[in-house]
Regions:
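Active-site HxH/HxHxD metal-binding segment of metal-dependent hydrolases
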Residues: 12, 23-24, 33-109
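Conserved beta-strand hairpin/beta-sheet module of binuclear metal-dependent hydrolase folds
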Residues: 1-49, 119-129, 135
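Active-site metal-binding loops of divalent metal-dependent hydrolases
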Residues: 31, 58, 82-83, 113-114, ...
């Protein structure tokens, strides 16, 4: 498996590149528009084809790079079905799976940071977007955020899980 955690200093956003390495297909979670060329170069360096890009929620603190990545790579843009975004090809529901070669990511509706926040569980890795941060949680004071919803949306995870970002 190929796994890269990338960090944008300006927006403090974590982006993830994931591939099984077998079929050379990849997906990216929470891309930042200013780093799209960096992602494209990394994909070339690793000999990967981007087929899916996921936004965990609509971001208020930065512009997503998903549409630009779609324009460059022809990948599919994915978000949870609670999103009001109209530029999404695939909308996933809570407990639905996204497949990439032999990798499965389970979509989990995790409102709280925003009303359209989703997290994605891959084996024991939870990609929580901005719901959980290093040493804290995401803000809940905009985009219909709610601190109680944020807590309740993640407390039910019972299996041992590595939370991203870490």
């Amino acid at each position: 498996m190929i796994f890269r955690q990338l960090f944008d200093n300006r927006s403090s956003t974590y982006t993830y590149l994931i591939s099984s390495g077998e079929g050379r297909e990849a997906l990216i979670i929470d891309p930042v528009i200013e780093n799209v060329n960096k992602y494209v170069n990394l994909l070339k360096e690793l000999n990967l084809k981007l087929v899916k890009v996921i936004d965990t929620h609509i971001h208020a603190d930065h512009v997503t790079g998903a549409s630009k990545l779609k324009d460059i790579t022809k990948c599919s843009r994915i978000m949870g079905d609670h999103t009001p975004a109209d530029t999404v090809e695939i909308r996933v529901k809570d407990d639905e799976y996204i497949n990439l070669d032999n990798i499965k990511l389970r979509a989990m509706y995790t409102p709280g940071h925003t009303s359209d926040s989703y997290s994605f569980l891959m084996d024991n890795y939870l990609f929580s977007g901005d719901t959980l941060l290093i040493n804290g949680t995401g803000r809940t004071d905009f985009q219909n955020g709610n601190a109680v919803d944020s807590y309740l949306s993640l407390i039910h995870i019972s299996e041992p899980t590595r939370l991203e970002p870490i």
